[in-house]
């Protein structure tokens, strides 16, 4: 079930405060955040947000196409180790 339209999008208050301060000053330095559930809002366009994936912060440059998505969608948490190698069958005669 999606979030109620009446409530509006969720953005961590401290993250939104940092974005607004940087917009007023005109700065564009990366912002570290652990809030993967925060939604991308138009105020974030042009900023780089370092989203934590459980191991390190992944820098994500925010563009217009990302509006309405969550920050966690752009920072994968799982690493693909590859498929298992085929092992030769023992005792098989060719």
Swiss-Prot record:
InterPro entries in the record: Ribosomal_uS19, Ribosomal_uS19_bac-type, Ribosomal_uS19_CS, Ribosomal_uS19_SF
Transmembrane segments: none
GO BP, one annotated term: translation
One Gene Ontology cellular component: cytoplasm
GO molecular function, one term: rRNA binding
Keyword annotations: Ribonucleoprotein, Ribosomal protein, RNA-binding, rRNA-binding
PROSITE patterns: RIBOSOMAL_S19 (PS00323)
Region (Disordered): 73-94
Family indicated by similarity: Belongs to the universal ribosomal protein uS19 family.
PANTHER family: RIBOSOMAL PROTEIN S19P FAMILY MEMBER (PTHR11880), SMALL RIBOSOMAL SUBUNIT PROTEIN US19M (PTHR11880:SF8)
Task performed by this protein: Protein S19 forms a complex with S13 that binds strongly to the 16S ribosomal RNA.
Protein's name in the database: Small ribosomal subunit protein uS19
Source organism per UniProt: Kosmotoga olearia (strain ATCC BAA-1733 / DSM 21960 / TBF 19.5.1)
Source species taxonomy: Bacteria, Thermotogati, Thermotogota, Thermotogae, Kosmotogales
